[in-house]
Amino acid sequence: MKIGASVRKICEKCRLIRRRGRIIVICSNPRHKQRQG
């Protein structure tokens, strides 16, 4: 899980979701998991 100031989709399967006021990226590729921190 990458935690950074800016998150973006890396591939076509990445999905941007807002959870508890945070923007997270979930993907079938675990390397693409990100959270805005």
UniProtKB/Swiss-Prot annotation:
InterPro entries: Ribosomal_bL36 (IPR000473), Ribosomal_bL36_sp (IPR035977). It comes from the Eukaryota. It is found in: Plastid, Chloroplast. GO terms for molecular function: structural constituent of ribosome. Keywords: Chloroplast, Plastid, Ribonucleoprotein, Ribosomal protein. GO terms for biological process: translation. PROSITE patterns: RIBOSOMAL_L36. Disulfide bonds: none annotated. Pfam families: Ribosomal_L36. One of its GO terms (cellular component) is ribosome. NCBIfam families: rpmJ_bact (TIGR01022). Belongs to the bacterial ribosomal protein bL36 family. HAMAP family: Ribosomal_bL36. PANTHER family: 50S RIBOSOMAL PROTEIN L36, CHLOROPLASTIC (PTHR42888), LARGE RIBOSOMAL SUBUNIT PROTEIN BL36C (PTHR42888:SF1). This is Large ribosomal subunit protein bL36c. It comes from Lotus japonicus (Lotus corniculatus var. japonicus).
